[in-house]
């Protein structure tokens, strides 16, 4: 990429980040979409429509008469739609300030994607303060991730506390930010992956309390190796505080992992990665997770972290409990080169991120858009299963699939009462073409 091309890309991305800021700061208006192929966890429906009142989805269906009535109920004219989906966003609707009716022209319509484990994109990390968060969120929003739990890397405890406070401070104005995920510092040294070993700690009560105090309600999940001293106790403490502990970056045997899940851990952090693997005499943490129907199982479907046969195996292990996550770092949707993950140097070659020091995998450059595309077009998953893994299942991990204090309306389905997070996709490539978040049109 030439210097001028790089500058143009940077300017374009900053412009989109600004548009997201402006749109989400405004009151949303009613909108409607029709002539779409709906795909969500409940199945596929042709000639589908939905109407939002500017807050939630209020009506869905496939009868024209019902569509006209639903539009009229929120002051929209069902016959005054755009000539084509490409004209969506013209004029002031680009900033989310106008109500409009969109003819999807046969495109696929899905709920917005929900990523519960990602560290950054577009050259920025969620540890990089307000500016880093807004840029990294814009990168994922561009690819259809309308809601995201912001993963924070292992750092000195004071830094992690400050980063939690930054996330907490942004949540009031940013409905797309669901809260924070701490991947560290309570990880096994032997399974640290791309985490600074100097910053790893045992989860003693003092450290647990410091993190909970700093988070002030914004902490959604924390990854813990349950075999560490005080590990099970820490899981209990976080769960009692309303945080969802996750088992991962661990060397736990089956019994210890089972105890962790029974104590309140509700997630397995990126199954197969940074943990002891399956063995017929030493089963380890994976069977403990897949046997427990309460556990949501994260999986990085990039073909690199987890090979395709193991992705299929994972879906067979835990049907309707696999959540696609990206574990994306700052290099996501960027050229190969040198980047930082926390304080650690990372080299990205052919889209694969590795620590410069020892070659360990250092996150991914995946988007949920690509994870869903791979699932359908390369692995042969049904559209329903692929979309479910990027929408309803991750939402369920935190109770966001029902009314809740964080998102108000539930996430993960295109149905009345659900949040107006909607994507329109190219039906051949599954590429994201248009995005609504919290009833705001963003692209």
Regions found by a protein language model. Name each.
Residues 287-297, 315-326, 332-425:
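His/Asp/Glu-enriched, well-ordered alpha-helical/loop segment
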Residues 209, 213-335:
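Active-site core of metal-dependent hydrolases
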Residues 138-149, 188-216, 258-271, 275, ...:
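Active-site gating loops and adjacent loop-to-helix segments of metal-dependent hydrolytic enzymes
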Residues 107-108, 116, 126-176, 199-214, ...:
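Alpha-helical scaffold segments that flank or form the walls of functional sites
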